[in-house]
């Protein structure tokens, strides 16, 4: 039987590439885009529970992200989306307490989690917080059938950020292939993606 996959943020650059990769690999994929859920309020959105209850996925992939330069308006959206959306998924399984089948939760972070950046202070901070969420959740679920993956790519060519055509960066398909590889392993994983060799 094909495994069932839910992809949050499936209309974005990495999300849409991930949808195509999993669909072509034979998974039963349920894509969730921003028009179905307001990702800013996803941290307290009952629709997340409803989707996970209805689909009963084997793999949950969260590609939702918010990227903005540092200004006084960025705080709530940046943390609500980059941290809160992932927490809402983890919280769903904490509330269930037990799973009778293996479940893999995969979150998309950023290489920015390693160091602050002056123009993206809160973005980098939110990705560092996501790393800690991943660590804590791995510890929480260590005696269960639930495992978690966190993938931290370097700069990736998506519409979310303004990148010059000539800039060195990953392609969304590169990240999607790494997510596919991560989904095949039932263990906790942290992957820091770098630029291809030679760049």
Language-model features, listed with the residues they occupy:
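Structural signature of the Rossmann-like NAD(P)-dependent dehydrogenase/reductase core
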Residues: 7-8, 61-65, 103-110, 147-152
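Rossmann-fold cofactor-recognition segment
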Residues: 33-47
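Short, flexible catalytic-loop segment of classical short-chain dehydrogenase/reductase
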Residues: 153-163
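Substrate-binding pocket helix/loop in short-chain dehydrogenase/reductase
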Residues: 71-79
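Catalytic loop of short-chain dehydrogenase/reductase
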Residues: 67-70, 104-142, 155
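C-terminal helical subdomain
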Residues: 150-151, 165-199
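N-terminal Rossmann NAD(P)H-binding glycine-rich loop of SDR-like oxidoreductase domains
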Residues: 8-20
